[in-house]
Amino acid sequence: MIMFCVQCEQTIRTPAGNGCSYAQGMCGKTAETSDLQDLLIAALQGLSAWAVKACEYGIINHDVDSFAPRAFFSTLTNVNFDSPRIVGYAREAIALREALKAQCLAVDANARVDNPMADLQLVSDDLGELQRQAAEFTPNKDKAAIGENILGLRLLCLYGLKGAAAYMEHAHVLGQYDNDIYAQYHKIMAWLGTWPADMNALLECSMEIGQMNFKVMSILDAGETGKYGHPTPTQVNVKATAGKCILISGHDLKDLYNLLEQTEGTGVNVYTHGEMLPAHGYPELRKFKHLVGNYGSGWQNQQVEFARFPGPIVMTSNCIIDPTVGAYDDRIWTRSIVGWPGVRHLDGDDFSAVITQAQQMAGFPYSEIPHLITVGFGRQTLLGAADTLIDLVSREKLRHIFLLGGCDGARGERHYFTDFATSVPDDCLILTLACGKYRFNKLEFGDIEGLPRLVDAGQCNDAYSAIILAVTLAEKLGCGVNDLPLSLVLSWFEQKAIVILLTLLSLGVKNIVTGPTAPGFLTPDLLAVLNEKFGLRSITTVEEDMKQLLSA
């Protein structure tokens, strides 16, 4: 059987249409796993439909609320490739739905839900049979009837909500829980399960998702800073230090903290990878002296870089790609919602097996000459610099600020972002976040009167800090955010980037430039609508874009 998936930037694009519709997608996801993820999403939509009904009766089920976004997160690009675990999530979704349904019936014997997903049952234990059942829920099944524009808007909402669900899970891990956010999530998820076909309603839904995600990023920020302190500028070594070692990748700061606690005094050094780099800026994480540095570059290079790393690797969230290519599948471990067939999975917070493996491996034989980069420009630090930025602008020492960030990826056209960064004039500042920074974060950019020209604000979710800074600057200057000498040039790859974009658009931010390509699920008509309404456009050339943005 074949699949249909068009959720990431590297999806196959042909004159006949966009999307991976083969035996395997560009990410390495098999048709089986992709189809079973469609089935899981349908089960989660049914669960959310009953959660909406339960809310009408004043019933809030925390097990449902904690599970639903986490399971949805497992379908995000480069997270879980393990078909049996995807089916396990679907079974758990149905079991929770039935328990929630029973709670509703106990209050009202006539309780019912009018949603096509509300009574979904899995037809078999056989993966092949389940894959055939999943064909009923493939996202483009009614494309001929509704057209590409409606399908594209549905997917914009589905993928945006998926990105928000990922951030909800990150926040939940840190003890952050908001009943209103979960209620809104269930309402949108259930509605998407009705296969809506009204263009205006779908556009409104996409903005609602963006607004909801702003709240999610707020509680995630509170969770991270509440537990680990506010990030402050910190130098990080990106070269090897002699000794045994473990590499930890993803976004989960709690996993990193637990690993650091358990490795303290063992002689094992810990390195961050990818989106874990900003962890070095948090006081409660950098206090561990054996958190010695950051290893590697963008996630897409992991098959080469992980193969060279002389210790075990822990994946706490996206992005994982096939570890068998570099023959390190015997020393990569997955956590939480991450999965790869045949790779060992850590069900809890005990990293002792990983530590034992690290102690049995060679580690780095010698320390390389250090190369230091600076991270840790968190929300408090950025807000503390607001008056300095305004002063520099007023004295014409600072002409423009470019927010240059987002996801990285393998496409060659992404060199645009390196070229753009190195072409930014000396009297301009670069604010960066997310893993797209690896395209230029090891380069030297100098400073403007002591203020670094390259300011690393953190992970993708730390777009929240950048938004708060922009709002603060606008308030102090008595203007709107769109009137600031500020331009957003964003790279995208997966669904977290989609929901960040929806968040910015829902807040009224205009004239954003994105690349390296437009999302494959957005038709020319939809791109035209977004351009007309928000000024959203794709990158062209560095020279043309720089000229246009500086003259705006």
Swiss-Prot record:
It comes from the Bacteria. GO terms for molecular function: 2 iron, 2 sulfur cluster binding; hydroxylamine reductase activity; metal ion binding; peroxidase activity. It comes from Shigella sonnei (strain Ss046). Its cofactor is [2Fe-2S] cluster; hybrid [4Fe-2O-2S] cluster. It is found in: Cytoplasm. Hybrid [4Fe-2O-2S] cluster binds at H251, E275, C319, C407, C435, C460, E494, K496. The keyword Iron applies. This is Hydroxylamine reductase. Catalyzes the reduction of hydroxylamine to form NH(3) and H(2)O. [2Fe-2S] cluster binds at C5, C8, C20, C27. It catalyses: A + NH4(+) + H2O = hydroxylamine + AH2 + H(+). The keyword Iron-sulfur applies. SUPFAM superfamilies: Prismane protein-like.
